[in-house]
């Protein structure tokens, strides 16, 4: 869903971009981009940037789209400003075959489409932001896929700005660095962005919520992958011998403070977020993301993960729990 109170160029670009599948794939998170389809949008954007006068627009081997726009006359001495958005969409729902359409919303439940003859709707109870959008035209998917507003809305906004500057180069602006990066949804984002070549003293990520919202700081972030090695024994002969990796995970997870989960935190409060777990008796893997604005508290959270693993290994008398933090 995306508010369409905007200029026609932004809307046209947005409707086009969301139809290009760019889902990242967490299973391939050891490579960038994690999915080849992200190159499809990257190449489109680079070509459009060149057509708009960004002669250096290019796509790197890792699917980063980078370009520069010269400053307007009289603003050459101003600090360069970066504008960043991400190409990929999340894999939590289907992302291919997006069919965007515009719904005029008058309040109440927002019906996006139908699936198997049943309406797909969002209620104001689950999405209170809808209360501020009555009377607006909203872009929705047909209910069978993601829409992809995160972050193709940001991509469209940046591209529309570049087009506006191309039409009127006298519009006051500093030198601009443009970057569209892959794999933000799986925690990589700007990881392989060449900051020196990007050449911007300041940068903003165009990826947010309500119109007019501005965030001027960011959290510290890490990903922790915790592996648990079990030992499978027939349940009838398991006493003193079986080590159930699934139960080890449960014990580990219980050692992390539940009040520091996303559903119990807000504002500057940091959290541990369990993103996924797979478990059998023999082996279990859990993946957490850790966030905190305070660097000291952030490090304490990482230390607690290591301490929890050490505690379980000490109890077991051998190393069966390992932690990798990125």
Name the predicted role of every residue range:
Residues 75-171, 175, 180, 200:
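Active-site metal-coordination/substrate-binding segment of hydrolases
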Residues 130-133, 148-156, 161-162, 167-168, ...:
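Glycine-rich anion/phosphate-binding loop at the beta-strand->alpha-helix junction
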Residues 76-77, 234-236, 295-300:
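Short, conserved charged micro-motifs
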Residues 11, 15, 43-46, 155-163, ...:
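Predominant activation on well-ordered alpha-helical scaffold segments within soluble catalytic domains
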Residues 246-326:
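Metal-dependent amide/peptide-bond hydrolase catalytic core
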Residues 154, 167-245:
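Fold-level recognition of mixed alpha/beta catalytic cores in primary-metabolism enzymes, strongest
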Residues 29-78, 82-84, 88, 99:
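A non-catalytic alpha/beta surface segment that caps or lines the substrate-entry region
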Residues 7-35, 140:
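N-terminal capping segment at the start of a domain
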């Amino acid at each position: 869903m995306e508010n369409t109170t905007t200029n026609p160029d932004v809307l046209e670009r947005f409707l086009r971009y969301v139809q290009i599948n760019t889902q990242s794939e967490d299973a391939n998170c050891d490579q960038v981009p994690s999915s080849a389809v992200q190159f499809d949008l990257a190449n489109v954007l680079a070509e459009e940037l060149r057509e708009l006068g960004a002669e250096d627009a290019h796509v790197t081997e890792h699917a980063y789209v980078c370009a520069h726009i010269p400053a307007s006359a009289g603003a050459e001495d101003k600090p360069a400003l970066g504008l960043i958005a991400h190409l990929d969409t999340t894999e939590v729902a289907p992302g291919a075959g997006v069919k965007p359409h515009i719904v005029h919303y008058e309040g109440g439940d927002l019906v996006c489409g139908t699936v198997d003859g049943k309406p797909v709707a969002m209620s104001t109870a689950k999405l209170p932001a809808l209360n501020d959008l009555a009377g607006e035209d909203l872009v929705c998917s047909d209910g069978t896929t993601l829409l992809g507003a995160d972050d193709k809305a940001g991509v469209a906004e940046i591209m529309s700005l570049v087009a506006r500057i191309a039409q009127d180069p006298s519009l006051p602006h500093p030198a601009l660095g443009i970057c569209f990066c892959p794999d933000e949804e799986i925690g990589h984002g700007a990881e392989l962005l060449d900051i020196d070549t990007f050449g911007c003293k300041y940068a903003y990520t165009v990826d947010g919520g309500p119109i007019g919202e501005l965030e001027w700081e960011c959290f510290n972030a890490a990903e922790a992958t915790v592996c648990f090695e079990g030992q499978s024994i027939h349940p009838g002969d398991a006493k003193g011998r079986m080590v159930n990796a699934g139960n080890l995970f449960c014990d580990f997870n219980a050692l992390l403070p539940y009040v520091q989960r996303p559903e119990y935190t807000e504002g500057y409060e940091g959290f541990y977020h369990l993103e996924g777990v797979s478990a059998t008796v023999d082996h279990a893997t859990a993946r957490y993301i850790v966030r905190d604005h305070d660097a000291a508290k952030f490090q304490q959270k990482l230390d607690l993960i290591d301490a929890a693993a050490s505690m379980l290994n000490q109890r077991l008398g051998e190393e069966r729990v390992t932690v990798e933090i990125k």
